[in-house]
Amino acid sequence: MMRVSEEEAKRIAERLNYRWPDRTVVAVAQEYKSGKVLMVASMNKEAVIKTLTTGIVHYWSKSRKELWVKGATSGHVQVLEKFYYDCDADSVLLVVRQASLIACHEGYRSCFHYKVEEGGVKVEEPSYE
């Protein structure tokens, strides 16, 4: 689990460019072991600081307009292993250990289970690697 001091977390959070109208950055969660992209969400400054200081991933819910801990109710917690931000400082990559076999609220390992193929869309079977 990766954690930093509150002082360092605030310094990092200040470097980010919260350019969207709701003052968030794009957050991509990638599974530590497999490298699989699990989900994309949003983080505001508070979510970044809480994630970095606790080692447990927090997001900003655009629909509910509130901070949420991934897995607080479902048990599908994400533990932070690495934290990166991009060259524009408006997106972050969270390398996480998914505490369960599910990251998606639809019950799949990844939110990216709709595969567009010639002839239509295929829903991939759940993969619990």
UniProtKB/Swiss-Prot annotation:
Residues annotated as binding Mg(2+): 86, 88, 90
Known catalytic reactions: 1-(5-phospho-beta-D-ribosyl)-5'-AMP + H2O = 1-(5-phospho-beta-D-ribosyl)-5-[(5-phospho-beta-D-ribosylamino)methylideneamino]imidazole-4-carboxamide
GO cellular component, one term: cytoplasm
Cofactor(s) this protein cannot do without: Mg(2+); Zn(2+)
A Pfam family that the UniProt record links to this protein: PRA-CH
GO molecular function, one term: magnesium ion binding
Cofactor comment text: Binds 1 Mg(2+) ion per subunit. Binds 1 zinc ion per subunit.
Enzyme class: hydrolase
Keywords annotated in UniProt: Amino-acid biosynthesis, Cytoplasm, Histidine biosynthesis, Hydrolase, Magnesium, Metal-binding, Zinc
Superkingdom to which the source organism belongs: Archaea
Enzyme Commission number: 3.5.4.19
Subunit composition and interactions: Homodimer.
Described function: Catalyzes the hydrolysis of the adenine ring of phosphoribosyl-AMP.
Protein name: Phosphoribosyl-AMP cyclohydrolase
